[in-house]
Amino acid sequence: MKDKELLALLKKNGWTVARINGSHHVLQKNGKTTVVPIHGKDVPIGLLNTILKEAGLK
């Protein structure tokens, strides 16, 4: 999955961008925080699974 697709999926599920630090977007929802790196490439599967678990989507 591309990084921008992941970002769009999280935003669709209620996550908002709290801040951007370089190429890392920090998203928040209900006091939870997750970081999505935006490098223009596919997100590695291990990192993708971790972000989806943190977001409650897996």
Q: PLM features: residue spans?
A:
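C-terminal structural segments of small proteins and small subunits
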Residues: K4-E5, K11-T16, V26-K58
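Arg/Lys-rich, often Gly-containing low-complexity segments of ribosomal proteins
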Residues: I20-H24
